[in-house]
Swiss-Prot record:
Belongs to the IcmF family. The gene is icmF. The lineage of its organism: Bacteria, Bacillati, Bacillota, Bacilli, Bacillales. This is Fused isobutyryl-CoA mutase. GTP binds at residues 210-215, 255, 347-350, 964, 1085. InterPro entries: Acid_CoA_mut_C (IPR006159), Cbl-dep_enz_cat (IPR016176), Cobalamin-bd (IPR006158), Cobalamin-bd_sf (IPR036724), GTPase/Isobutyryl-CoA_mutase (IPR052040), IcmF (IPR033669), IcmF/GTPase_domain (IPR053439), MeMalonylCoA_mutase_a/b_cat (IPR006099). Is composed of four functional domains: the N-terminal 5'-deoxyadenosylcobalamin binding region that is homologous to the small subunit of ICM (IcmB), a middle P-loop GTPase domain (MeaI) that likely acts as a chaperone for ICM, a structured linker region involved in dimer formation, and a C-terminal part that is homologous to the large substrate-binding subunit of ICM (IcmA).
Length: 1086
């Protein structure tokens, strides 16, 4: 067991992932170990700007900041953070960081010299281990932030943030009495603070754990800021201390979107030794913020039990937050806060039974307060859905809250918000009556297999009876014996279903077809002739598809029901009869710097290919829906790890020279949060391209009617995929930017637009497990969560009135391939489950039953140590994907562990695929996995494990209910920690990383000389200049266009249809900000 350093002082850390960076797996592991080692951790989550991190660190009076940065731009990010701390007089706060192999030794050295306390490298991780790195951080930060009072009291009345923070820390020292020197200084200071106190209302918010107090607090703060001019708010948020370790997770900040305002101060406090829901320093802390000139103090407690009501002793107005899940009505009689609270909130009011719960609470409140002369409906009990943007129930609560504060505290605040009698969910994703869909799906698959197995037993008996008849005839048995057997045979034949009879009747014909020289198939009324054998150098004919040599009817049925030939239900071996000739599944990502630079890379990648299969990686600024800017933490990320695209002009430059409507051209875009905006830019690019061709052909501008014809033809012809999978973003990758319901609404709008305009060749979503795997999930979890997400989209689109066969063909999937054994069958299991469910449960047609998926080799399996070995891993993963008949494949470059791929590394990655498909002999056969005992066993094992995961998700309220409970994220993080622990202990051997180590490791100079693909300063400047030129050119049109977009969104219209127009005159960042106003920002979860 590793030694754990236990700090002598209360060490506090702010932890986060850097701006435009969703890779939070490692920082979550770090913050967990920090807590377990005794630190108080204020976790901000992913995608945090330097400004947000520094503000939080100063307000929280921490000793250290720990940030992970995996998306490039780290030099600017960390230096800017250091500079900002110096500028704001907080030079004592130490900065720690890490980014795997992305931050190379010379950059680490430069950052250390600049003043960053420590940037941990993969070598540090190997040498020190996870706990060892945490020990270094704790030991270096084990000091008090304040011991004496200097000029804090003079700076306090002006609201100086550092003065407030330091004085609250002194309040904590005073309450504990452990630091005698600090406690004495605090004693004197607090007496002076009390003399400066003003009369300020204090709102206390308390409630059960998990009731949504932080989200509700954030929504109330947003309304206070919007409704009451110039109001200044202080929030004191309390979370429990772990008595065993002394550590605490102070997690309320992560839920707050409204606090990044100069009018808001927030401080997180741990309960430490108080043994209640409040910090022992809470009264003194309230005095400090009152003296600092705030107009409202909000106290949010940790989760409480039935008998807790301490909040009422320190506030003027108290609010109790609960949900409908309190058990029997008699339980309400035990809740002290119902006796004391001024306002009671039933949050998460969309849940079943909330209306009944509200009435029960109203009755209990009426009894507790002896208000029998008033109608029960007048009791101050309010239903809210705080997670819903601009929730009418929260508006009604806010109006009542302002009225209560005015009455009890003598304020004269006004609000223009309207009240409602009934609270409803605006955009219901899964209707209540469909909430058990995942359990139904699991049962559908098992039922199919049970029926198949029953048919197998019938067919086997039939085969045995036929054999007995034949044997009896050969021996010359009596006619009555043979008649009895014939009768028995007829009985068993009658038990066969028509489908089973058809399979058996056509089996020999099927075998004959595949034994022929050629095979003719039809795809969309077009005949395709396929040669069925390939001659080896030795002169043997290798068949494309091999069928089993079964004679037993039972074995034939089992094989067809569970496996079947590629292109036939249940599509276990593949959704098409044969691979497409002349178009390998090869697809290579590109994305770096400016659109012009990436365009050149695209042309380089496919210069020798007839088929142009382009996959686009966007930089993190684009992934988060923002525009390039000179601010250092943004500037450093522009064009790093992807291409910068923020206008329609950029999109046109990106695909210049490619005919986007050529049947051999296909474009995939890896974009999620702002996907509707980028997709609108892409579709406009394709349309404008065809319009220009048509106008050149005609020698004149098109008429409006001709333009519409070209537009419709383009939409129906263009091929490609946009990722746009918002569920997996919340669960794993974290590039969510809009509130989840609003983001899903836009996904549905895209699909409705596709149906209306008959977009048949473009996938509206790529339901992705890749990023779930990259965040740390094992292969079974990846597959289960991804398929569950897919079925959730199916249920949502059906609830919007779309027909299954109108949208299912627009759904595609995306998986990772690692080296675990389960990856050998990930495609087989996915195809079989999808096909069975689509046919048996949803009544979908053949096209809708076919699950098509892209594979990318595992990025997580690429290691910064011995990077040359990565190509070996990638080769094995690519081989698995090709054996399993994936529809499209991207092979990672070996140097992606440390940089955006270079031309040399990309060429090697492409060669891996080419060698497998062109040189490796067994790939001439297209069903090499069929007939393998281990593959069949693994397929069944993985399928059942996936169905069990569906049931676990179902029991938590389906995919969305589980997301609310953080089930998926928690499971992914647990599996990530398990993997990392095994890797660090060496139990999981990783060649070149923890075993078979290089006896002559590369020197620091050699590591520093590795070629890195980075965007240049000039490229970043070019993007900003181009953006501003676009905005200037459209300055008169952008405002009205954005207003129209907001109007469509608020009126429930099709947002994507309007975006097709908006993108012509507004930039990505402008559109994103407009949509935030009407749809709300994503709220991070712990």
């Amino acid at each position: 067991m590793a030694h754990i350093y236990r700090p002598k002082h209360h060490v506090r850390f702010v932890t986060a992932s850097s701006l435009f960076d969703g890779h939070d797996a490692s920082i979550n592991i770090m913050r967990r170990i920090l807590q377990a080692s005794g630190a108080e951790v204020i976790h901000l989550g992913h995608n945090r700007s330097v400004e947000e991190i520094v503000n939080a660190a100063i307000q929280e009076d921490v000793q250290g900041i720990a940030v992970s940065s995996y998306q490039g731009g780290h030099m600017e990010f960390f230096k800017y953070m250091y500079d900002l701390l110096q500028e704001r007089g907080a030079s004592h706060i130490r900065i720690y960081g890490g980014g795997g192999g992305v931050i190379i030794p010379r950059e680490i050295k430069e950052l250390h010299e600049y003043g960053i306390a420590r940037i941990f490298s993969p070598e540090d991780g190997r040498r020190l281990g996870l706990q060892g790195m945490i020990n270094v951080m704790l030991e270096e930060c084990d000091f008090p932030t304040v011991t004496v009072v200097t000029d804090e009291l003079e700076r306090l009345p002006s609201g100086d943030v550092q003065a407030i923070a330091r004085l609250i820390t002194l309040c904590e020292y005073r309450a504990e009495g452990e630091n005698k020197e600090a406690a004495a200084a605090a004693e004197a200071a607090i007496e002076q603070v009390k003399a400066l106190e003003k009369r300020v209302p204090v709102l206390g918010i308390t409630g059960t754990g998990g009731a949504g107090k932080s989200s509700l607090t954030d929504e109330l703060v947003r309304r206070f800021l919007n409704e009451i001019p110039d109001i200044k708010i202080a929030i004191l948020s309390v979370d429990p201390t772990k008595q065993k370790t002394g550590g605490a997770l102070l997690g309320d900040r992560i839920r707050m979107n409204s606090i990044n305002s100069p009018r808001v101060y927030m401080r997180s406090l741990a309960t430490r030794h108080s043994r209640t829901e409040l910090s022992p320093a809470i009264r003194d802390a309230i005095s400090v913020v009152k003296a600092a000139g705030f107009d409202l103090v909000i106290i949010e407690t940790s989760g409480i039990g039935q008998g807790d009501a301490a909040i009422t002793e320190v506030c003027d107005v108290s609010m109790y937050v609960m949900t409908s899940e309190f058990g029997a009505p008699t339980q309400l009689e035990k809740i002290d806060m119902i006796d004391y609270a001024d306002l009671i909130v039933i949050n998460k009011f969309e849940r079943k039974g909330s209306e009944d719960a509200k009435r029960q609470v109203q009755k209990q409140y009426q009894r507790s307060h002896q208000l029998f002369d008033r109608d029960v409906s007048e009791m101050p009990v309010y239903g809210t859905i705080a997670s819903q943007f601009n929730d009418p129930g929260t508006n009604t609560l806010f109006v009542a809250l302002v009225d209560t504060i005015n009455k009890k505290a003598g304020t004269n605040w006004k609000t223009s918000l309207k009240t409602v009698a009934n609270v409803e969910k605006h955009n219901v994703i899964i209707p209540n009556e469909r909430r058990y869909y995942l359990r139904e799906i699991a049962e559908t698959v098992r039922s199919y297999h049970r029926r198949a197995e029953q048919q197998v037993e019938v067919a086997r008996r039939l085969f045995q009876i036929e054999g007995a008849i034949e044997a009896a005839k050969e021996r010359g048995e009596a006619e009555d014996v043979i008649r009895a057997l014939e009768t028995l045979k007829a009985d068993y034949e009658a038990k066969l279903t028509p489908e089973s009879k058809r399979i058996l009747a056509t089996w020999e014909e099927t075998k004959a077809k595949y034994a022929a020289k050629q095979f003719v198939t039809k795809v969309r009324d077009k005949e395709i002739v396929t040669e069925l054998t390939t001659k080896t150098l030795s002169g043997l004919d290798i068949p494309k598809v091999v069928l089993p040599k079964f004679k037993d009817y039972g074995e034939i049925l089992r094989w067809v029901y569970k496996e079947n030939v590629p292109g036939s239900f249940p599509y276990t071996a593949g959704v098409f009869p044969f691979k497409r000739q002349g178009e390998d599944p090869k697809r290579q990502f590109a994305g770096e710097g400016t659109p012009e630079r990436t365009n050149r890379r695209f042309h380089y990648l496919c210069k020798e290919d007839k088929a142009k299969r382009l996959s686009t990686a966007f930089d993190s600024v684009t992934l988060y829906g923002e525009d390039p800017d000179y601010r250092p933490d943004i500037f450093g990320k522009v064009g790093e790890s992807g291409v910068s695209v923020c206008t329609l002009d950029d999109m046109k430059k990106l695909y210049k020279g490619f005919d986007l409507c050529d049947p051999l051209t296909s474009v995939s875009m890896t974009i999620n949060g702002p996907a509707p905006i980028l997709l609108a830019m892409f579709m406009n690019t394709a349309i404008d391209q065809q319009v220009e061709k048509k106008e050149a052909e005609l020698g004149r501008p098109l008429t409006p009617e001709e333009y519409e014809q070209v537009k419709e033809w383009t939409l129906q012809t263009v091929r490609g995929t946009v990722q746009a999978d918002i569920l997996k973003e919340d669960q794993g990758q974290n590039t969510c930017i809009f509130s989840t319901d609003f983001a899903l609404k836009m996904m549905g709008d895209i699909q409705e637009y596709f149906i209306k305009h008959r977009v048949r060749n473009y996938y509206s979503v790529s339901i992705s497990g890749y990023h779930i795997a990259e965040a740390g999930a094992n292969p079974i979890t990846q597959l289960a969560f991804t398929l569950a997400n897919g079925f959730t989209y199916v249920e949502y689109y059906l609830s919007r009135g779309m027909h299954i066969d109108d949208f299912a063909p627009n759904l595609s999937f995306f998986f990772s391939n690692g080296l675990d054994p389960e990856y050998s069958v990930i495609g087989r299991v996915a195809r079989r489950i999808w096909a069975i469910v689509m046919r048996e449960k949803y009544g979908a047609n053949e096209r809708s039953q076919k699950l098509k998926y892209h594979i990318q080799t595992s990025g997580r399996s690429l290691h910064a140590q011995e990077i040359d070995f990565n190509d070996i891993r990638t080769t094995l993963q690519a081989l698995l994907a090709i054996y399993d008949n994936c529809n499209s494949l991207h092979t990672n470059a070996y140097d992606e562990a440390i940089t955006t791929p270079t031309e040399e590394s990309v060429r090697r990655a492409m060669a891996i695929q080419l060698i497998i498909t062109k040189e490796f002999g067994l790939t001439k056969n297209e069903n090499p996995l069929q007939g393998s005992f281990i593959i069949e066993e693994l397929t069944d094992l993985v399928e059942e494990a996936v169905l069990q995961e569906f049931e676990r998700l179902n029991d938590r309220g389906g995919v969305l209910g589980a997301m609310e409970m953080q089930y998926q994220r928690g499971k992914i993080q647990d599996e990530s920690l398990y993997y990392e622990t095994k890797k660090h202990t060496g139990e999981l051997p990783i060649i070149g990383v923890n075993t078979f180590l290089n006896p002559n490791p590369p020197s620091e100079d050699e590591l520093n000389n590795i070629q890195l693909a980075r965007a240049t300063y000039e490229e970043k400047e070019t993007q900003i200049r181009n953006l501003r030129e676009f905005q200037e050119r459209n300055k008169d049109k952008a405002g009205p266009a954005l207003e129209r977009l907001k109007q469509v969104a608020t009126s429930g219209g099709n947002i994507f249809e309007e975006l097709m127009e908006t993108v012509k005159v507004a930039s990505l960042g402008q559109i994103t900000r407009a949509l935030y106003e009407v749809g709300g920002q994503y709220r991070r979860n712990m």
